Curated annotation (Swiss-Prot):
[4Fe-4S] cluster binds at residues 341, 401, 404. NCBIfam families: leuC, PRK05478.1, PRK12466.1. PANTHER family: 3-ISOPROPYLMALATE DEHYDRATASE, HOMOACONITASE, MITOCHONDRIAL-RELATED. This is 3-isopropylmalate dehydratase large subunit. Catalyzes the isomerization between 2-isopropylmalate and 3-isopropylmalate, via the formation of 2-isopropylmaleate. It is an enzyme of class 4 (lyase). Heterodimer of LeuC and LeuD. GO terms for biological process: L-leucine biosynthetic process. It comes from Phocaeicola vulgatus (strain ATCC 8482 / DSM 1447 / JCM 5826 / CCUG 4940 / NBRC 14291 / NCTC 11154). Belongs to the aconitase/IPM isomerase family. LeuC type 1 subfamily.
Length: 460
């Protein structure tokens, strides 16, 4: 019987199927951060239960960590409590913990792949919706709730209903200035934020195959924003080259055995998906959002739609201060944020730096450039990107989720416009009253140096 990549990994991890109910699925890796794990550990204590497979669990703070002065105590009491509680829980239960200032620390969805903890064929969960990021490595990865975190801690298994399968094929070549982020925003603009609800998505096609590992991670990161349970890309030589030599990757003979197995992790030629969607890469241009959900996006040279008369559409535009039919080109912006688990990797910093090289940041723009991890930070400095950025008027902050969400010091003031490389533009996501425009690192860089929304292709 022909199987999809998802089927192969899912079926290999089934412990038992509950009759007319969910599947008991074995989990290879559980990642925990400080926000969704405290109640799970409290539940274990209340029941007197130990962690079943402590060697399969990795903990690190990221949401609440400040992006400056990390060597000092966190000032916000709530943030400090959450970060300290995670450290205590990890110690008490004997779990790996990458705390602040630990050079292994960073955003959990950046650290997992770069440390070789996330590997093809794995099942991976975390109490975070953007766990789908790890699917780029050829894994079945998805976000779970706190009660489910407790379930995995206690048993290394989870009860899940099997999602349907979808394949999104993107063929052709991306044009100048078009990135994986633009691919994702384009898909969402066509499919809406509910277009993949109930499905696990496999991305395929020549445009996907030609993406770097970082690009694939960005693509899978945004799967949840289409309503998908998760997203994945079949592993190939790009994947293997990325993993080889990383800290937790297999070594020697084990590496050869692993790669041999990983090469079998692909959908069979005659595998049948529940739904198939196709896009042409040539139709995609640099994208930007204009509303208050990630599906409200358009090509940067396009105009805000005029045919949507719904109350929710009007409410969204009122919040953003925009009008139907308006072009965003030349619109003054106030903040630029480069970072998040969507675009906080080395390739994103290279792209941003390539555009601002030899230019200067607009005086009125506040720019937060936040590496996704200390490893990314080190590579930025090894490649001399920090010097180029400093000459252009930018500074590198310390790793963390930062302005992706208003849960730490990096908040956008009310009414201000932020061109952000993160993944969500909901009302108040970056701060009460903040107006978020999601975009790629290149679009963010163009806005940072011109002070207005600019087509990056004009500056490349």
């Amino acid at each position: 019987m022909a199987n999809t990549l998802f089927d192969k990994i899912w079926d290999a991890h089934v412990v038992q199927k509950v009759e007319e109910g969910p599947t008991q699925l074995y989990i290879d890796r559980l990642y925990c951060h400080e926000v969704t794990s405290p109640q799970a550990f409290a539940g274990l204590r209340a029941r007197g239960v130990k962690v079943f497979r402590p060697d399969h669990v990795y903990c690190m703070p990221d949401h609440n960590t400040p992006t400056h002065d990390q060597d000092k105590p966190i000032e916000d009491p709530v943030s400090k409590t959450q970060v300290d509680t995670l450290a205590k829980n990890a110690k008490d239960f004997g779990l790996a913990h990458f705390g602040m200032m630990d050079k292994r620390n960073g955003i959990i969805h950046v650290v997992g792949p770069e440390r070789g903890l996330t590997l093809p064929g794995m099942t991976i969960v975390c109490g975070d919706s953007h766990t789908s990021t790890h699917g780029a490595m050829g894994a079945v990865a998805f976000g779970i709730g706190t009660s489910e975190v407790e379930m995995v801690l206690a048993s290394q298994c989870i009860l899940q209903s099997r999602p349907k399968t979808m394949r999104i094929t993107i063929d052709g070549e991306l044009g100048k200035g078009v990135t994986a982020k633009d691919m994702a925003l384009y898909m969402m603009s066509k499919m809406t934020t509910s277009g993949a609800t109930g499905f696990f998505v496999e991305y395929a096609g020549s445009a996907v195959r030609n993406l770097s590992m970082e690009g694939r991670l960005t693509l899978c990161n945004l799967s949840i924003e289409m309503g998908a349970r998760g997203g994945m890309v079949a592993p190939d030589e790009v994947t293997f080259e990325y993993i080889k030599g990383r800290e937790h990757a297999p070594k020697g003979v084990d590496w050869d055995k692993a790669v041999s197995h990983w090469k079998t992790l692909k959908s069979d030629d005659d595998a049948v998906f529940d739904k198939e969607i196709r896009f042409d890469a040539a139709d995609i241009q640099p994208m930007i959002t204009y509303g208050t959900n990630p599906g409200m996006g358009m090509g940067i040279t396009e105009h805000i739609p005029v045919d949507d008369k719904s109350a929710s559409f009007k409410k969204s535009l009122d919040y953003m201060g925009f009008q139907p039919g308006e072009s965003l080109l030349g619109k003054k912006i106030d903040y630029v944020f480069l970072g998040a688990c969507t675009n906080g990797r080395i390739e994103d910093f290279r792209a941003f730096t390539s555009l601002v090289r030899g230019k200067k940041k607009a005086d009125h723009v506040t720019a937060w450039l936040v590496p996704g991890s200390w490893m990314v930070d080190a590579q930025i400095r090894e490649e001399g990107l920090d010097k180029i950025l400093e000459e252009a008027g930018f500074a590198i902050r310390q790793p963390g989720c930062s302005a992706c969400l208003a849960m730490n010091d990096d908040k956008i003031p009310a009414g201000k416009y932020s061109v952000s490389t993160s993944n969500r533009n909901f009302e108040g996501r970056q701060g009460p009253g903040a107006r978020t425009l999601l975009a790629s690192p290149l679009v963010a860089a163009a806005a940072a140096v011109t002070g207005v929304i600019t087509d990056p292709r004009e500056l490349i």
